[in-house]
Amino acid sequence: MKPLHLKLNNFGPFLKEEIDFSKIDNNELFLISGKTGSGKTMIFDAMTYALFGKASTEQREENDLRSHFADGKQPMSVTFEFQLNNRIYKVHRQGPYIKEGNTTKTNAKFDVFEMVDGKYEIRESKVISGTQFIIELLGVNADQFRQLFILPQGEFKRFLISNSREKQGILRTLFDSEKFEAIREILKEEVKKENAQIENRYQQIDLLWQEIESFDDDKIKGLLEVATQQIDKVIENIPLLQARSKEILAFVNESKETAIKDYEIIEKKTLENNILKDNINQLNKNKIDFVQLKEQQPEIEEIEAKLKLLQDITNLLNYIENREKIETKIANSKKDISETNNKILNLECDKRNIDKEKRMLEENGDLIESKISFIDKTRVLFNDINKYQQSYLNIERLRTEGEQLADELNNLIEGLEKVEDSIGNNESDYEKIIELNNAITNINNEINVIKENEKAKAELDKLLGSKQELENQINEETSTLKNLEIKLDRYDKSKLDLNDKESFISEIKSAVKIGDQCPICGNEIQDLGHHIDFDSIAKRQNEIKEIEANIHTMKSNIAVHNSEIKFVNEKISNINIKTQSDFSLEVLNKRLLENENALNNQRELNKFIEQMKEEKDNLTLQIHNKQLRLNKNESELKLCRNLITEFETLSKYNNITNFEVDYKKYVQDVNQHQEHSNQIEDKLIQLSQRKLIEQNNLNHYEKQLETYNNDLELNEQSIEMEMSRLNLTDNNDINEIIAWRGEQEELEQKRDTYKKRYHEFEMEIARLESLTKDKELLDSDKLKDEYELKKGKMNTLIDEYSAVHYQCQNNINKTQSIVSHINYLNQELKDQQEIFQLAEIVSGKNNKNLTLENFVLIYYLDQIIAQANLRLATMSDNRYQLIRREAVSHGLSGLEIDVFDLHSNKSRHISSLSGGETFQSSLALALGLSEIVQQQSGGISLESIFIDEGFGTLDQETLETALDTLLNLKSTGRMVGIISHVSELKNRIPLVLEVKSDQYQSSTRFKRN
């Protein structure tokens, strides 16, 4: 990501400000300079806020970014343009604020644009989705951006001095290692779940084992005393338990079967005695009831006499009823004959009227026949009347169109002949164009090589001059440095170290007196006077310091010039002078012009020929289409003429409308005549059928009357014969007998009931006498007592057997469940062993006491430290190297950083470094971190870095080394910007972004020193 343009409105001290980063040439190192509080860091805040909606430091909130001097009606906004992977983007973020006069907050806005074909096209227009788009585009979030692109105050050395837990948070964010922690948690939960399942299965086994019935049997109790944790012993005891349970069940079953047999014997004996007792009682009762039934015998005999008489008179009564029915039928037949004769007379009258109507209709038959003939002949015309009518309408139009098409066809043919004459024998020559293009390309390449070589030679001469000038300066500075070192060597430094010696000597003098033994040398003190000229020594010390400062300045200048020579040498090595043509630029340009003219002429000729061919093809196509249209016109015109001729010949009409009206009228007349004729025929047929039906009915009624008269005569004869047989003289005798018929059913039922009961008593008494014959009745009370005793014993043993059988089966089921649980538990422990081991390893229970996440983070930290040491070795003159502290505890250590001092060959805590050494280490570590993150992430493009930290803690030599490091970053294609108050940087860095403040707002400008 490389900044291009930054626009700030009401942001911090900037009310309306624009910064054009495109003024920075070739990723030049530049300094951001200004007074304290002028808003230098706010530039970093603006870029971070534009991208992520956050400041460059976590401590600064969004509300702190709005200018206190902003117009209450204007929003705070930042517009940031940047380049990423050769594509240009623009983001515009407006912060939320309460507009002056309002009580509700105006919402934030965020738009993301991408430049396409020189214009910006919007990609996102919502705050949340837009910010997510930027995170995915850059490949980093706000925290990662602070670590990789912008190193703000307070953040620069945080990674270096942080403890393991703090580094874990930073590295977790940068390398997205939370997924490894998630794996650990998943495995932890999986193990926890598996352990719970295993424990639950142990509990189920123990519960089942405790529930096994012992039957109060000592052997079973002994087997059940085994603890369920002894799984193998439990498996061994289960068959023994089952065998002993079967033995107990068999013993109880044998007792039960004996009791059942005893019960069945007494039950049978009791049942037989009860049956005998019931049979004797029933026999006595039936005999008494039978005697009472026989007393009804006289009444039954009287009933049978009445029923016999009723049976004998039945035929006579039937004949009397039949006579009444026959007389009714005769009367009905006479009535039907009279009504049928009247219907026949009415039908004959209706037929005469319809015959008259038919004769009137037949008088118009000839006229209707002529109309039917016309309809049959012209029906085909009427069915397609639209076709013929359209022919009358189209014939004139088709004549006109045909003449017009013929004229247009002749014109097109003439045009085609002219185009063919223009083309002649000419053909397009594209091979010649290819040859000319190749020749032009080759000439342009030769011209470009000559121009590039001239430019490269000029650049080489300039660089060689700069190099020579730098070498001369280095020679002069080296000579001056040698003179200063010679001058410095002339001083005896061993006698000039006066740090605290003067006060130390004064303290010794105050503690001793003349004659005492010296605590330093052990000799007797002879004199306490002054023997050292401290003023002279101090003067020489100042001279030495001045020389050492000059030496340091010379070394710094030499280092800077050596770095510049190195940079110039790199540029010289990158200059490539290619082999060029023997021809001069003038000759090549002349040949280029000739080929370009020939190319243009050939292109014009090809273009003209192609246009003529295209016009020829177009005319040919038009002629073909016109000919098709003309042929179609002639065909349609011929068809219209044939249809009109056909219509007029068949119909004898020359007007479609008149024909259509007459045809419809004829059809209507014919249909009406036909319909009327059909109606008359239908009526005649119906009348004939109805008359025939009535005639048949009349014959039927007459025959029926004759039959009824004969039946009546025969029935009278039968009545006379029956009365004679029954000795009945008149109807009174008959009526008396008829009165008994109402009681006949009751009398028959009474008789039948008597006979049925009489027979049943005979049968039942005979049966009971056979059952009780030769049998003795026993004492019922004694039998009952014995029965109850045997039954109680049997039920008790059955219940006991059922309980024992159920408990045995239950024991079998439980032991089977126990075996199943144990088998599943063993398999589960075997299957999950690898998961348990893996969970322990990733949780830190391993030989390194590291969690999986910390193991990964240590791997990345080792890579970062290795990359950082490449630069730290240069900056510290091969004295310091960063090392990772190897001592670890359970999962949370191993990320601390110590420094290894190659001078003392020992490692020490990072806090023992001086301010300048800490800055060097922090810078090297930050650059190493950014490079490793870029290597791992792939999609992150680190084209710029901004630093706001610590240059004031560096001495001159260290400052020069740090600048060399940053210059090397620039040579890798990265824009480097730094914030500092160090005056030497203003002299060393030619490009400065100056931030000025006038108390209430700030402004910026680029300037060169």
Swiss-Prot record:
Residues forming coiled coils: 176-208, 264-366, 392-501, 535-638, 664-802
Protein name as annotated: Nuclease SbcCD subunit C
Function: SbcCD cleaves DNA hairpin structures. These structures can inhibit DNA replication and are intermediates in certain DNA recombination reactions. The complex acts as a 3'->5' double strand exonuclease that can open hairpins. It also has a 5' single-strand endonuclease activity.
Gene3D superfamilies: P-loop containing nucleotide triphosphate hydrolases
MF annotations from Gene Ontology: ATP binding; ATP hydrolysis activity; endonuclease activity; exonuclease activity
Annotated ATP binding sites: G34, K35, T36, G37, S38, G39, K40, T41
Subunit structure: Heterodimer of SbcC and SbcD.
Presence of the UniProt keyword Hydrolase in the record: yes
PANTHER family linked to this entry: ABC TRANSPORTER ABCH.3
Originating species: Staphylococcus aureus (strain MRSA252)
Record flagged with keyword Lyase: no
Keywords tagged on the record: ATP-binding, Coiled coil, DNA recombination, DNA replication, Endonuclease, Exonuclease, Hydrolase, Nuclease, Nucleotide-binding
Family under the similarity heading: Belongs to the SMC family. SbcC subfamily.
Alphabetical GO biological process terms: DNA recombination; DNA replication; double-strand break repair
